[in-house]
């Protein structure tokens, strides 16, 4: 396909237009007085949300050069969401501020490489200043405050705090639909381990890129599956019952994995395969833990068992299994309480006998997974649209809370970013490098300015007032007053604020140093071409 190329100012201005279109849409949601955005869906009802990354990912612009600029900002939001789980709107606002100021200077003749060095230096100093002002999460109230601010809902904050209290800071918390309109927290037996799906074609939810299996059978084996014939009798039995299947195996290689994926895509059955957790003897022990939890049997050479002879009775079962690219969570396994308790007691005895600190630590992890359970937040709402919006808020709140547990929290409402500006004044630089530092200093004001403007207040007035206040005093947009943000319970996770700034600075610096943009030239006849004939498919596996 022919390419269209733009250079220098033409390239940067086209991309800047895309950056602004996306950022202007996302930033309307910022702060306690932020608005919602309605997203059209290809099917079903529209989605109403204030979740920055969801909005950013849904935007496609007609002009391909503008679209590239928009996609780079969406990448900032997505990366921030991947690292910290929240802060996507802050990252977008910071990116827009840095890019706009940077483009003006580059257009005026400044050297973009010098500006980039200044941006990098300023970001490094700002991140260190954020870490120094960070406070550790110590109480249930701290967790409740962080979750409440992220979700803009005190009830959600209380739910998350209750869930974390029940399963611990490192415990597994999942989100499900409730059958009623109320939202509640239940603790069920379950566990999570660090292994994700073997193929992304196994996902059932393309937005979240995760696979959800309701009431599945679970095949647990320490064998390598390379021939589909080995598990064919078992697959046929599962298909006849109309149930989903989770396969936990040493590995699936050869033609076995493509065959499973092909049948999954065709809708023959719903299957997800993951590698067994752990290594060596620890792997065998963890597989046995999963078998006890789900009421299944480990199909193992050690026991003289064969996959060809395995029956449905030897499969484990669970109420629900969720698999992401990195983790597998089994909720409400079908194992008997007596068997689980017996296994727990056995692990406790092993801990008591062990003389190795490393072994004790690994045994404690197994014990926590087996006995800690999984907290399930059941989200209820009157309509499907409200349910989607509520789940987005709860997911953000949960992610923000986990981030705060890891790295602590700082004063919220953009206050921390204003408070780090004096640290940037101490950096020694000149010329274009100094310009880059000043660009970051100005950008650090943008989140507070946007929160104020969304609340109907002049942003510049609020920013100037905050610069004259002592550290920690911020603008509470919900009540329209200045106060100590930590005492008021308005806090942000340090990881969220840090990631937003680092990712915004990284992509902004790349945009400013862009000198040429290459895009596909639109084909004027594309809409007039007849659709391609459908391709023939392979026969079914069964």
Swiss-Prot record:
It is found in: Cytoplasm. Keywords: ATP-binding, Chaperone, Cytoplasm, Isomerase, Nucleotide-binding. Residues 524-535 have a biased composition (Low complexity). Its main location: cytoplasm. GO terms for molecular function: ATP binding; ATP-dependent protein folding chaperone; isomerase activity; unfolded protein binding. SUPFAM superfamilies: GroEL apical domain-like, GroEL equatorial domain-like, GroEL-intermediate domain like. It is an enzyme of class 5 (isomerase). Its EC number is 5.6.1.7. InterPro entries: Chaperonin_Cpn60_CS, Cpn60/GroEL, Cpn60/GroEL/TCP-1, GroEL-like_apical_dom_sf, GROEL-like_equatorial_sf, TCP-1-like_intermed_sf. It catalyses: ATP + H2O + a folded polypeptide = ADP + phosphate + an unfolded polypeptide. ATP binds at residues 29-32, 86-90, 413, 476-478, 492. GO terms for biological process: protein refolding. Residues 521-542 are annotated as: Disordered. One of its GO terms (cellular component) is cytoplasm. CDD domains: GroEL. Together with its co-chaperonin GroES, plays an essential role in assisting protein folding. The GroEL-GroES system forms a nano-cage that allows encapsulation of the non-native substrate proteins and provides a physical environment optimized to promote and accelerate protein folding. Belongs to the chaperonin (HSP60) family. Forms a cylinder of 14 subunits composed of two heptameric rings stacked back-to-back. Interacts with the co-chaperonin GroES. PANTHER family: 60 KDA HEAT SHOCK PROTEIN, MITOCHONDRIAL. This is Chaperonin GroEL. It comes from Limosilactobacillus reuteri (strain DSM 20016) (Lactobacillus reuteri). The gene is groEL.
């Amino acid at each position: 396909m022919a390419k269209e190329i733009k250079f220098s100012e033409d390239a940067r201005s086209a991309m800047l237009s895309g950056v602004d279109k996306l950022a202007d849409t996302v930033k309307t949601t910022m702060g306690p007085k932020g608005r919602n955005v309605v997203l059209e869906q290809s099917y079903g009802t529209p989605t109403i949300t204030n979740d920055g990354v969801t909005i950013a990912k849904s935007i496609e612009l007609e002009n391909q050069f503008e679209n590239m600029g928009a996609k780079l900002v969406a990448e900032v939001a997505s990366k921030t969401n991947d690292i910290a789980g929240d802060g996507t709107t802050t990252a977008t606002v910071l990116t827009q501020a840095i890019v706009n100021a940077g483009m003006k200077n580059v257009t005026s003749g400044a050297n973009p490489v010098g500006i980039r060095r200044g941006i990098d230096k300023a970001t490094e100093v700002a991140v260190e200043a954020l870490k120094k002002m960070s406070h550790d999460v110590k109480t249930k109230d701290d967790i409740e405050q962080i979750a409440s601010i992220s979700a803009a809902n005190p009830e959600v904050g209380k739910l998350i705090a209750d869930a974390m209290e029940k399963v611990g800071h490192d415990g597994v918390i999942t989100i499900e639909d409730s059958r009623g309109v109320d939202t509640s927290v239940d603790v069920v037996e379950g566990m999570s381990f660090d292994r994700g799906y073997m193929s992304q074609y196994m996902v059932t939810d393309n937005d979240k890129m995760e696979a959800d299996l309701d009431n599945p059978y679970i095949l647990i084996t320490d064998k390598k599956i390379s021939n589909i014939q080995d598990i064919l009798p078992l697959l046929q039995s599962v298909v006849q019952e109309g149930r989903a299947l989770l396969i936990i195996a040493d590995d699936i290689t050869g033609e076995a994995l493509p065959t499973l994926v092909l049948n999954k895509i065709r809708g023959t059955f719903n299957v997800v395969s993951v590698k067994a957790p752990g290594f060596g003897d620890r792997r065998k022990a963890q597989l046995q833990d999963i078998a006890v939890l789900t009421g299944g049997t480990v199909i193992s050479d050690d026991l003289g068992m064969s996959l060809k002879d395995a029956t449905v009775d030897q499969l484990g079962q669970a109420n629900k299994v969720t698999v992401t690219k990195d983790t597998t969570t089994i909720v409400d396994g079908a194992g008997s309480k007596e068997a689980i308790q017996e296994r727990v007691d056995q692990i406790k005895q092993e801990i008591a006998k062990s003389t190795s600190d490393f072994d004790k630590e690994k045994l404690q992890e197994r014990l926590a997974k087996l006995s800690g359970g999984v907290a399930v937040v059941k989200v209820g709402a009157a309509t499907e649209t409200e349910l989607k919006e509520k789940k987005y808020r709860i997911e953000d709140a949960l992610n923000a809370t986990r981030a705060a547990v890891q790295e602590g929290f700082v004063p919220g409402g953009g206050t921390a970013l204003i408070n780090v500006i004096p640290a940037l004044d101490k950096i020694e630089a000149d010329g274009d490098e100094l310009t880059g530092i000043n660009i970051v200093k100005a950008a650090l004001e943008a989140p507070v300015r946007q929160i104020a403007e969304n609340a109907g207040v002049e942003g510049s007035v609020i920013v100037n007032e905050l610069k004259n206040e002592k550290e920690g005093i911020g603008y509470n947009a919900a009540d329209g007053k200045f106060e100590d943000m930590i005492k008021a319970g308005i806090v942000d996770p340090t990881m969220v604020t840090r990631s937003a700034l680092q990712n915004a600075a990284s992509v902004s610096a790349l945009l400013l140093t862009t000198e040429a943009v290459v895009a596909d030239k639109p084909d004027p006849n594309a809409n007039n071409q007849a659709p391609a004939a459908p391709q023939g498919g392979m026969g079914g596996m069964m």
